[in-house]
């Protein structure tokens, strides 16, 4: 018993010393998400849950490694998001959902908290890493948002290779498209209206995004978001992910936010910038601001989803009003956290 107690004290002392030493550094932190929605433990096999957790951990560790070495927050979030874009598990890049016509249209945005510089792309079909192209728009163009064919022409000028759209094809996303179209036809037969039919689709068909927010050792915040959009979307629909202030926002004076959810609501309520404004002008904590917008503003009107937030002190908050949100975080004072379901 005494031996066990001594080991516990020694272990505790080491942890305390380690935390004290870490807290003396300039704070740095990163949080990521892989989308919010009807994500329930009963729907996962142990192997599936393990695979999702491993990919989330890989992404957050990749971004954290950049920060730990003194790298910029912009590089950290780009690195983390690229890991998620390369995974078929999440609705971005290789895991992008299908449009109604059976193709893939990708959106992304990024924002620099130092100066509010931002870049975004929407409706691209042949870009392997949308977040990288959004970064190039921010760094190498005089514009903020480029779309469709024009965005891809810009990509070619920047030396980005265009790829075939079918590289984003996955069996599980195609099966989801078929189910969505069947539901749409059934609802349309009743309503005689595509818009009304699409509104009646379950929330999971309307959500799915990846994103990251980070604070680096120099005190600079950044946020980025990437998505394949909404299953069975039509007419060139664009959601909140590439919209600065809705799906992405970062400002050193307040916080950095990346959102995931039913994009139309997040656009209408300027979710990302609203959270930052409450922090900046009302002196709210990110916990207060995030809870107010996600649970008090959006939830009552049917706006489902969540956000990840980091502030200038390295505090992290990840509120959501759905049954789950793929998420992970790490800071110089917090060990790696990975969560999927509520109450984790």
Language-model segments: residues:
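Sec-dependent N-terminal signal peptides
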Residues: 4-13
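N-terminal signal peptide c-region/cleavage motif recognized by signal peptidases
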Residues: 16-18
